[in-house]
Regions:
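Acidic beta-to-alpha connecting loop that harbors the catalytic carboxylate
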Residues: 13, 60-63, 113-115
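A conserved short beta-strand
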Residues: 28-38
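C-terminal catalytic histidine-bearing segment of alpha/beta-hydrolase fold enzymes
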Residues: 55-57, 68-71, 77-133
Length: 133
């Protein structure tokens, strides 16, 4: 196993697991791609571990895992990677990439107009994101 290419992705509960991996096992995993996930309310992610690259997506009309919970989990990874608040649009639309992150540890976030689900662009975008490593 190439230890520099270990990734985690998941949807809903799997997205929560990917966020947890990003917080607690960023020294093992290179990147995560949570979709419609968040962090458990009793999970103490401090956002202080080693940086981890992330591509994440969340539907704006998700009623199962509220978008604000996904944003809160994303913000822990932004903190962990020392990212700024400025973003630039990236493909696929409506994704944005945060600026000022630790070199090699980009954070891409895609809020799409949809419910609790996987966006139609999700699988291809995640594969492309992971292939850069």
């Amino acid at each position: 196993v190439d230890n520099t290419r270990i990734f985690s992705t998941g949807f809903s509960y799997g997205g929560m697991m990917s966020f947890a991996v990003g917080c607690e096992l960023s020294d093992v995993f290179r990147a995560i791609a949570p979709m419609a996930g968040s962090l458990y309310s009793d999970f103490n992610c401090r956002g202080t571990g080693p940086a981890i690259a992330m591509w994440g997506a969340h539907g704006t009309s998700d009623t199962v895992v509220p978008p604000e919970d996904g944003r809160a989990a994303r913000d822990k990874i932004l903190q962990q990677n020392h990212c700024g608040t400025e973003t630039v649009p990236v493909e696929p639309s409506p994704c944005v990439k945060y600026q000022g992150c630790d070199p090699g540890y980009d954070v891409t976030w895609c809020e799409w107009d949809g419910p609790h689900g996987i966006p139609n662009f999700g699988s291809a975008a995640i594969a492309e994101f992971f292939l850069q490593f």
